[in-house]
Design a protein with these regions (language model features):
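N-terminal targeting leaders
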Residues: 1-38, 45-48, 52-218
Length: 218
């Protein structure tokens, strides 16, 4: 039996609110408020994401409008922001191209993609590029809400016994708030970093403290 880790398809929202290129500003704002979301993917006629339009995109448009009272000085506006200020549909308002993920991605892969592109959510697409879900930062954080007992059972059963073949109870596992403490002995010293690495890869693990030692040959 191999260790099974939750991937994007296990955590994503499948019933996705989306919009088309021609959706007007007010309709986008209405959708965001109606569904209590902060962004939604913009798709083409084949349901492939071409961009994402967010509250920030809508507010950026409003921020570039002239002050009706004439009290605020006109600010220097970059060309991209001027274009958004003049846009009236999703195609002009959206941030594109869409940064996407795939259902089989690990939590780590999705998190790194969000971090590298400074986004809070990713449309999820299948092999043909069609939208099948959305994964958010909040979805990824759910991994760390696993019960300590579930984490301990996976480490003891999958990591130590089935994967590494260690004798039962040769290593004791304590888990508190996702922090793992390992105590016991292993046959070979070079197994210690392997045990630590595999434990860190278990869903929900926040940190690993190892007090493992090589078993005495005496």
């Amino acid at each position: 039996m191999t260790m099974q880790h939750r991937c994007v398809s296990d955590l994503m929202t499948r019933d996705v609110v989306r919009t088309g290129r021609d959706t007007p500003f007010k309709e986008i704002a209405k959708l965001l408020m109606e569904y209590d979301i902060t962004a939604l993917p913009v798709v083409d006629d084949a349901d492939r994401p071409v961009g994402v339009v967010s509250e920030a995109d809508l507010l950026r448009k409003e921020a570039q409008q002239p002050d009706p009272a004439g009290l605020l000085p006109a600010a220097h506006t970059p060309h991209a922001d001027r274009a958004k200020a003049e846009a009236i549909t999703a195609e002009g308002l959206m941030t594109s191209p869409a940064v996407v993920s795939h259902p089989e991605w690990s939590v780590v892969e999705a998190a790194r993609e969000m971090e590298s592109h400074h986004v809070k959510r990713l449309p999820v697409v299948d092999d043909s590029g069609r939208l099948v879900g959305v994964i958010s930062r909040a979805d990824l954080l759910r991994v760390f809400l696993r019960r300590d007992s579930a984490i301990r059972e996976e480490i003891q059963g999958d990591v130590l016994t089935r994967t590494l073949g260690l004798a039962p109870y040769s290593v004791t596992v304590h888990v508190v708030d996702g922090r793992v403490t390992l105590k016991g002995t292993v046959e070979q010293a070079n197994l210690i970093p392997v045990v630590e690495r595999l434990c860190r890869g278990v869903d929900g693990v926040v940190d690993v403290r190892s007090d493992l030692e090589q078993k005495s040959s005496a």
